[in-house]
Amino acid sequence: MIRLIMKNLWARRRKNGWLLAELILVSIVTWVIVDPLVVLTHDRNLPEGYRPDHLFLLQLASYPAGSEQFRAEENDTLARKANFERLLNKLKHYEGVKYTTFILNEQYPSALSISNGNTMFDTIPVRTLRLAFIPHTDYFRTMGMEGAEGMTAEQLDNRDFLWTESVLTADISQRLKDGKPLYGRRLGNGDEEDYRVGGVIAPVRYRSYMQPMPIELYVYEEFPDYMYYYIPLIALRIDDHLSEKVFLHHFREWMNKELTVGNYYVKSVQSFSDIQEQHEFSEGITNQYRLNLALGIFFLVNLCLGVAGTFWMQTRSRREEVGIMLSFGGTPSHITRLLLYEGW
């Protein structure tokens, strides 16, 4: 049978050559379409390192001096501080809210802005994204981050961090390639103050469509007075059993009445899930994913139809040959195997 197969292939070498060229071309085009789709799907299914579900972002603002709602007696630092604390207290005691925290410098996962730099381990630089947090503000539990190297988010929230300490993501240890734990390691290049790693968290995907990137979270020891004027964002986490849409509907009605304190008011509130979707759409990731998915399905269907059609045309054009083989005692199963082996 093998000898007969080789003779048949050689006799149809020109036609089979065209078929082979078509298959190679289709395979290349399909791979160009499928490869980014597979990579993006893989990256999207990696652990995020934080929980965007049931997490909301509030943007506060203050009335300008020319506004009708502006109150001059509430505009000094002491009044702003008191009003800010009243607003936070109302927010923390709203039904369904578990944790609240500050988002400093408008930098958070899926934010448009990025701050990066080098985290030095003696003479070894590691490129990191840089975020900031204030200790004892439930930052890690609010964001849903996971501790690493034996730490928990609760322990990190309750720890008395110094301004010379940083929290690093665990994937930085892979960049150092020395197998040593990160916690307690000295930072800097040897001629600076004693900076150290005060905590370690699981790797975080700063972009929902990318793999985790090394992150350093540095410490603000206290809430500085200038932030009562340059107001930070506020993140809040609600109970897991609550519906985000229902909560947001009732919360917006409540905040318009109750969260206007002094010259402060809530400018907007948005879920982190919506922030992720909007960022992916603005970066063209959503359109790219949909386009590649549609083209991938289109080419896959056409590839299956092409293979089936080619097999049908080949067998139809060889009916006379099949009839001759049957007349010489060939069985249908033998002829079927012959055609399949030729295709293989």
Feature annotation, model-predicted:
Residues 2-7, 305-343:
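Intracellular coupling helices
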Residues 13-38, 284-320:
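Hydrophobic alpha-helical transmembrane segments of multi-pass inner-membrane transport and secretion
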Residues 36-127:
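Membrane-proximal extracellular/periplasmic loop immediately following the first transmembrane helix
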Residues 170-171, 192-289:
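"Rare, low-scoring activations can occur
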Residues 125-216:
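Hydrophobic secondary-structure segments that place a key small or acidic residue at a functional site
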Residues 67-82, 126-130, 160-163, 203-213, ...:
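Solvent-exposed, non-transmembrane alpha-helical starts
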Residues 1-67, 321:
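Alpha-helical transmembrane segments of integral membrane proteins
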